[in-house]
A protein has these predicted regions:
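An exposed, glycine/acidic-rich loop-and-rim segment of catalytic or binding clefts
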Residues: 49-82, 88-266
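Cationic, low-complexity basic patches in intrinsically disordered or flexible, solvent-exposed regions
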Residues: 8-10
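A composition/secondary-structure signal for short, hydrophobic, low-basic-content segments
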Residues: 24-27, 42, 230
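Bacterial N-terminal signal peptides
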Residues: 36-46
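Bacterial N-terminal signal peptides that target proteins for export
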Residues: 13-18, 22-35
Length: 266
């Protein structure tokens, strides 16, 4: 496959995709994958080891929300000392600790200390955004001649799934590990008409951390009606460490065949 390479310094750019589901004989399925490669020294930490000497997945409470919902964190670990924490609220990446080129471990994502802070800040910090990442202008769209009006939460526009998007939902979780990777899988059902979107949408997001120091995020969804969807991961990264200051000297290379231009409304 040929790719167009886009290289830029991090400022205000965003790469988006726009997907429409159409039902034929069966439920339509969309899948895509985001892979993050953490490049650094191959350092095996004494505290982790390899094989059966350490637990690849740890689960613990992360406190409760103001409405009483209990939140849990799943820590995925590998043999290189990398650890990523995912919580069932919003399928959020809470932290990503990895070894840099100098052998130092840093948390390279931004996050909060309490789960309620993620809802109060409304910054979509580390969350899976859905049903639709970015704005839909005036909260309106049409499919097959049918007009739909969404819940508006950004002036007249619908932003990141609406008033109660996927980032504010509790996801069902399951875990799996083998001798080279650890996975937490999260599932969510969005009912027909939720936030104004047509179709019942069943979404799965899985995070897999491998001993090759890759964090792989797989997305899949099925719908029973023509709809729009644009799932994304809204983590804020600073490869120097979350408390290291500006990221404006970072450079990003995106291998993409195409991109969707965006403006302040969509």
């Amino acid at each position: 496959m040929n790719y167009a390479s886009v290289k830029f310094k991090l400022k205000s750019y965003r790469i988006l995709n726009y997907l429409i589901f159409y039902r034929r004989s069966d439920d339509q399925i969309i899948q895509y994958r985001l892979l993050l490669l953490m490049v650094g020294m191959t350092v095996l930490l004494q505290s982790c080891g390899t094989g059966s000497n350490f637990e690849r997945i740890l689960e613990r409470p992360f406190g409760s929300l103001d409405d009483g919902r209990e939140v849990r964190i799943f820590s995925l670990r590998n043999a290189r000392g990398t650890e990523v924490e995912i919580m069932d609220l919003g399928a959020i990446i809470v932290s990503l600790n990895t070894v840099d080129a100098h052998g130092n471990i840093s948390d390279i994502t931004l996050g909060y200390d309490e789960p309620q802070q993620y809802l109060d800040a409304n910054a979509y910090m580390g969350a899976v955004v859905g049903r639709y990442g970015n704005r839909i202008a005036e909260g309106k769209f049409s499919i097959d001649g049918q007009d739909y009006t969404l819940a508006s939460n950004n002036g007249p526009n619908a932003l990141h799934g609406g008033i109660v998007g996927f980032d504010k939902k509790m996801w069902k979780t399951s875990i799996h590990s083998d001798n080279s990777s650890a996975t937490v899988s999260l599932d969510l059902i969005s009912e027909d008409g939720e936030e104004g979107y047509p179709g019942t949408l069943s979404t799965n997001v899985s995070y897999t951390l491998t001993d090759g120091n890759r964090l792989i995020i797989d997305y899949s969804a099925t719908t029973d009606k023509a709809t729009v969807i644009n799932l994304t991961q809204h983590a804020y990264f600073n490869l120097d460490g979350h408390n290291a200051g500006s990221i404006l000297e970072h450079e990003v290379l995106i291998n993409a065949e195409q991109f969707t231009p965006a403006n302040i409304e969509s």
